[in-house]
A protein has these predicted regions:
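A polyanion-binding, active-site-adjacent surface
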Residues: 3-4, 14-181, 191-196, 201, ...
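Catalytic core of Fe(II)/2-oxoglutarate
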Residues: 188
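Short hydrophobic/aromatic-enriched beta-strand-loop microsegments
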Residues: 202-211
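Short, charged, surface-exposed secondary-structure boundary motifs
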Residues: 212-223
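Intrinsic-disorder-associated, low-complexity terminal segments enriched in Asp/Asn/His/Tyr and depleted
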Residues: 6-9
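Charge-dense polyanion-binding interfaces
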Residues: 241-242
Length: 242
């Protein structure tokens, strides 16, 4: 079994590859500010199985020093990344597409269904993860009354999280992130917030929005192939203009 204690703290070793940086980042990931009443944080990186699965996944696909484009979702949900610790990767996709067995209940998450359809069309996990790194504006997820909560759903939560979001983003840039463009999942509030943050921090040359996978699966399911093509076209454009 792989433990986060096996990995050094961020930036402590110039010989760290992309996977080492990711796993060291997860090792220290926590929220120290007080959350609004009733809001609970999802921290899968404190669970032994999630820690082991993250180690297997990131060592399989990120054991190099290649630069990658960053894709930012909103925050993990309780049925996907909130369980496995891997963004948009539920236990079923982790086993079926990535070949990493696990004992979690094999439930599908809608967003993961779309993401892995797109990854499959791109050429498979190995090719996709060699060029892209998926995270979220808030790399930790939230629930309230047992339901998923977005960081922007509660104004007080968004305000409390700002320093955590900025600190997390800056740490992830050290992994080897390409800053010419960042892809944002969501064309509404997530895109607006990320643009405002980028105007303040001046990190990326451009933020490119993509329809959120959950929106596609809930409201445009019959057009999945169209949206897969939209993703692939925007990714190809970014790679070709690099």
């Amino acid at each position: 079994m792989i433990f986060f204690s096996d990995y050094p703290d961020i930036a402590s070793n110039n010989f760290m590859d992309f996977s080492d940086h990711i796993l060291s980042f997860y090792k220290q990931l926590d929220i120290h500010s007080g959350l609004p009443a009733g809001v609970e944080v999802l921290i899968p990186y404190q669970q032994d199985q999630a820690v082991s699965l993250c180690g297997q996944f990131y060592k399989k696909y990120y054991s190099d020093k290649n630069k990658r484009f960053l894709i930012l979702g909103i925050n993990p949900g309780r049925h996907g990344g909130g369980i496995t610790g891997i963004p948009f990767t539920d236990p079923l996709k982790l086993e079926k597409y990535c070949g990493i067995p696990n004992t979690f209940a094999k439930k599908s998450e809608l967003s993961a269904d779309f993401i892995y359809s797109m990854i499959d069309a791109y050429g498979g996990p190995e090719k996709f993860y060699n060029q892209f790194y998926i995270s979220a504006v808030s790399p930790l997820g939230f629930t309230k009354d047992g339901k998923n909560l977005n960081y922007y759903d509660v104004k007080e939560l968004q305000e409390v999280l700002k320093n955590f979001i900025i600190d997390s983003l800056r740490k992830q840039l050290e992994f080897g992130i390409e800053t010419t463009v960042c892809f944002c999942l969501g064309e509404g509030k997530n895109f607006k917030y990320l643009n405002r943050l980028n105007d303040e921090l001046k990190i990326f040359n451009a933020i490119v929005s993509l329809p959120h996978p959950r929106f596609i699966m809930q409201y445009r399911r019959k057009q999945i192939q169209h949206f897969v093509d939209v993703y692939l076209e925007k990714f190809e454009s970014a790679i070709n203009s690099k």
